[in-house]
Amino acid sequence: MKSIYTFLLLIIVVSACQSDFDNADLDSLLRNQDVSKKRALKIIEKAIAAVESSELKTSLKNELRSNVKYNYTIYRSSSEPVKITADIHDETYTVRATYYIHDSIPYFMQGTMRDQDRASGRYTHQELITYFNGKKVIKQLKKTALNKENRASDLSHIPSVDITEDIKQPDLDALLRYEEVKSILKIQ
């Protein structure tokens, strides 16, 4: 279970902090970052709280690439997706935390890739742990995020993950710019 939340945090950290890391730094982060379920959920909560505040800024100072969105999507059962979107450079990753009243519903993992190599399925809790322990999704993420020289050919490998957890999340729909997300999701 811990590896699922580690993966969730890795995507958020890579997305929020990418301009601060070179390829070696990102590779080290993906291989070595370790975080608890509690901490991963707190990062989501921080993002939600910031979106709901009235102090959001709209300026975008992107020293690398622009016009590509990173989507932080929190899903609730029987409702529309809750999205936190940031306009930042390079790839698009989607992080989904799915809310259910009953946490006994099997964990759901969906890997989504552009145009080809589509793979999705419903897994039990243990099957999902096994999947992530096998590093399949992490390898896809690393290939996409780190291979900047051959980025055009790697855009078909963009994973997304649904994590089912009995957590309460408010409805929200807001756009965040790169610097805002970077600040909001900064790990202390």
Question: What label would you give each PLM region?
Answer:
Residues V13-S15, K186:
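Amphipathic alpha-helical interaction segments
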Residues N23-Q188:
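Extended, compositionally biased repeat/scaffold regions that form elongated interaction surfaces
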Residues C17-F21:
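Bacterial signal peptide processing site
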